[in-house]
A protein has these predicted regions:
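Gly/Ala-rich beta-loop-alpha elbow adjacent to hydrolase catalytic centers
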Residues: 212, 232, 236, 240
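The conserved beta1-alpha1 loop
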Residues: 155-159, 234
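C-terminal motif of bacterial Sec signal peptides marking the signal peptidase cleavage site
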Residues: 13-16
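Alpha/beta-hydrolase fold active-site loops
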Residues: 152
Length: 376
């Protein structure tokens, strides 16, 4: 316990001073002049506004004049548009484009949520066919897909110590560096937004599994997305992995091929996943064959996951201790990597310039790593 106190003190100092989201460093591939991710972005997209869709199961305290989201989970799904902007009114598109296609050393602008435009509330027992609001939301998703250069849909699932504005900003900057050519939904599960309330986040993530699984099924059933991709960061794996395992159970009489065609799961990317390694492997076996690919990006020196392993009393999938696995689990991982499009991406600070050895945010904070994420 004595060794844990310095970490607890540091976490306590940081808990009340969450920094704003700044535009992530430009991926290396975009700074060499080899490719301009915004080449196909039409005039309507050449703006500092980067709206993304959102869905949340946060309980709302009051509805008007606008919903006040709490840190409590519910079984309802709220969906709409998150209006996000990069920088303030003085930043123009030309400057943002230059910053996004070069290794400009200047201070990065803040990415901030201006407003949430709630379009629909779908109760836990309510069907889309009985909700005009939900139908309108999914029609908007289809309209966005039709206008996009990429027919796939990406769901971003944030980690712990997060807030609604932060979740929206992270999803928006990811969409921005995808050349704004992909439809992105930020799934804002009820994180308490404090490092000191990590265990609250763990409990809330568990309470969010059913709503997230439902969202994936609703998107598959009500949109024209060719594939549904998921990017889960850190404790977002505690929502995503068990939800996918739940979806891995077929409906009565459903064949595996029919299930695969119904769900249309594409690339599932776990960035620094904060979830028990053994649990992750067990759940992976229930759904990996339904996807195009499952990837885990792991830094074996990740300091955040070292702390999470102490709290959870088990190594995390983003910093795995493979000796914890049974013989059967180890054999499955080998088989999955050879036959089922599963891979572990080792993020080694010794091989990546200027990457902090203990980095947890490497997937968006490092220009060498972030370029490998945005390959959809």
């Amino acid at each position: 316990m004595a060794r844990l106190w310095p970490a607890l003190v540091l976490f306590g100092l940081l808990a009340g001073c969450q920094s704003p989201v700044r535009l992530m460093p430009t991926p290396v591939g975009f700074t060499k002049g080899e490719a301009d991710p915004f080449e196909k972005a039409g005039p309507a997209l050449q703006t500092t506004e980067v709206p993304v869709l959102y869905a949340t199961n946060r309980l709302v305290l009051i509805e008007k004049p606008e919903p006040l989201h709490t840190i409590l989970p519910s079984q309802d799904l709220r969906m709409g548009i998150a209006h996000v902007r990069v920088g303030d009114e003085t930043l123009d598109w030309e400057t943002l484009h230059r910053m996004s296609t070069s290794d400009d050393p200047g201070e990065r602008p803040i990415v901030h949520l201006e407003s949430l435009e709630q379009m629909a509330v779908l109760k836990a027992d309510e069907e889309v066919k009985n909700s005009a609001e939900a139908q309108a939301f999914f029609a908007l998703v289809n309209k966005a897909l039709a206008a996009s250069h990429n027919p796939e849909l990406l769901i971003y699932v944030h980690g712990s110590n997060n807030t609604v504005p932060r979740a929206a900003a992270q999803a928006a900057q990811f969409r921005h560096f995808m050349g704004r050519r992909m439809v992105v939904i930020s799934f804002m599960w009820p994180s308490a937004g404090s490092l000191l309330r990590y265990l609250t986040d763990v409990n809330n993530a568990a309470a969010t599994v059913d709503p997230f699984a439902r969202l994936v099924e609703l998107l598959a059933a009500n949109t024209n997305a060719s594939k549904i991709d998921v990017l889960a960061y850190s404790a977002g794996a505690q929502v995503t992995s068990p939800a996918l395992a739940q979806l891995g159970a077929p409906r009565p009489g459903e064949t595996r091929d029919a299930q695969r065609a119904r769900l249309r799961l594409g690339q599932i990317y776990f960035a620094a996943p904060d979830i028990d390694t053994r649990r992750f492997v067990n759940e992976l076996g229930t759904y990996v064959d339904l996807t195009d690919r499952v990837s885990v990006a792991a830094n074996l020196n990740d300091s955040v996951l070292r702390f999470a392993a102490i709290v959870g009393r088990a190594s995390r999938a983003g910093r795995p201790n493979l000796s914890e696995l049974s013989t059967e689990q180890s054999a499955f991982l080998v088989d999955a990597s050879q036959k089922m499009q599963f891979d572990i991406i080792k993020v080694d600070p010794n091989d990546i310039p200027n990457l902090p050895e203990s980095s947890h945010a490497f997937w968006y904070d490092d220009p060498w790593v972030s370029g490998s994420v945005g390959t959809w």
